[in-house]
A protein has these predicted regions:
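Glycine-rich beta-strand-turn "strand-cap" elements at beta-sheet edges
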Residues: 2, 39-50, 76-99
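Short, well-ordered beta-strand segments in beta-rich or mixed alpha/beta enzyme
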Residues: 2-9, 39-69
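Short, surface-exposed ligand-recognition loops at beta-strand->loop->(often short) alpha-helix junctions
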Residues: 10-18
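An amphipathic, aromatic/His-enriched active-site/gating alpha helix that lines ligand/cofactor pockets
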Residues: 24-36, 57-92
């Protein structure tokens, strides 16, 4: 299992536009082989650099890479998303703790 973490710099006043675009991408990705789960986080601080942080789990690195295909690239080319800076990277768990 791998985790894609993507932080988004969304300009003030563009949150709803961004989130509408994100929902389209999420619907597309959820149908992809190897998709496990997704959580989109929104900062409680309105002046945070990264207003949104997306955490997506995939069965494997290969599944994640295969899902980022031409259809995905077409969706993220829409102005609501293409004008937003993002920092995607894949991560593996190196430590986990629970209460």
């Amino acid at each position: 299992m791998v985790t894609l973490i993507n932080c988004f710099e969304v300009p003030a006043g563009r949150e709803e536009e961004f989130f509408a675009g994100y929902r389209k991408v999420n619907a597309y990705m959820r149908a992809k082989k190897g998709y496990v789960s997704n959580k989109m986080h929104r900062s409680l601080a309105r002046d945070a650099t990264f207003r949104f942080v997306n955490v997506v789990q995939w069965e494997s690195r290969e599944a994640c890479e295969a899902a980022h295909d031409a259809g995905f690239r077409e969706l993220i080319a829409q102005p609501a998303l293409s004008s937003v800076r993002s920092t995607p990277a894949l991560y593996e768990v190196v430590h986990e703790a629970t209460a």
